[in-house]
């Protein structure tokens, strides 16, 4: 039973490390919000600038921000409210994709210490069972056995603590990325649906 617990702890640590590295590569700020797209959004002041923005977004089509801006740019003929609704629906989908894997880290945070505790309890039951069957108690051997058993709890905590740190960090980073993408998309939409300034009538000729 103890060996099964240790195997589960090793598997848990491998899964946790895999998702920590994978999310670290995916959630790079430059990959999600490329500076080139930020600059293009700043430069896109009028409908005539939209083709330039679309070209830049197509060059970075792996970015969630580029996909959102392309969606909004392709629907500029729609009413503003409908375009915003479509954009918000797609944004929720993109955020879910960014959060993929974080739930696994959250599960590992909860399950790793419990697996360690199970290993400790099973080991303690075995150790004290052997003591009960033995005619003489070897204190040194018992202490050594208990120390070995407690390693399961230590391993579980060593797996859970880094997972908790990275889960908290990645969760906060996704929130920050979502706010930045929302800000840039809102800025783009606001500019494209901005009412043109009223034309100033020509000055009346002065009476001679």
What residue ranges belong to the model's regions?
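Short, strongly hydrophobic alpha-helical membrane anchors
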Residues: 1, 136-138
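Pore-lining and gate-forming transmembrane alpha-helices of multi-pass membrane transport proteins
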Residues: 6, 140-167, 171
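Lipid-exposed faces of alpha-helical membrane segments in multi-pass integral membrane proteins
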Residues: 8-21, 108-118, 159
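Hydrophobic/aromatic residues in alpha-helical transmembrane segments
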Residues: 13, 20, 120, 124-127, ...
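Generic hydrophobic alpha-helical membrane-segment signal
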Residues: 4, 10-11, 94, 98, ...
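Predominantly long cytosolic amphipathic alpha-helical stalk/bundle segments
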Residues: 30-118, 122-136, 168-208
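Hydrophobic membrane-targeting segments
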Residues: 1-38
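Short alpha-helical segments used as structural interaction elements across diverse proteins
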Residues: 20, 25, 94-97, 148, ...
């Amino acid at each position: 039973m103890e060996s099964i617990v240790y195997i589960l702890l090793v598997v848990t640590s491998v899964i946790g490390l895999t998702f920590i590295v994978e999310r670290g590569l995916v959630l790079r700020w430059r990959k999600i919000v490329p500076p080139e797209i930020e600059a293009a959004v700043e430069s896109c002041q009028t409908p005539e600038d939209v083709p330039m923005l679309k070209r830049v977004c197509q060059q970075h089509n792996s970015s969630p921000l580029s996909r959102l801006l392309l969606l909004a740019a392709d629907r500029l003929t729609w009413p503003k409210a409908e375009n915003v609704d479509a954009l918000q629906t797609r944004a929720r989908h993109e955020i879910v994709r960014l959060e993929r894997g974080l739930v696994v880290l959250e599960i590992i945070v909860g399950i790793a210490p419990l697996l360690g505790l199970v290993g400790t309890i099973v080991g303690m039951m075995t150790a004290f069972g052997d003591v009960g069957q033995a005619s003489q108690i070897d204190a040194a051997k018992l202490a050594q056995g208990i120390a070995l058993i407690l390693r399961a709890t230590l391993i579980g905590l060593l797996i859970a603590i880094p997972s908790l740190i990275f889960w908290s960090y990645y969760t906060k980073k996704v929130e920050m990325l979502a706010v930045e993408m929302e800000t840039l998309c809102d800025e783009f939409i606001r500019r494209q649906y901005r009412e043109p300034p009223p034309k100033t009538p020509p000055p009346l000729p002065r009476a001679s």
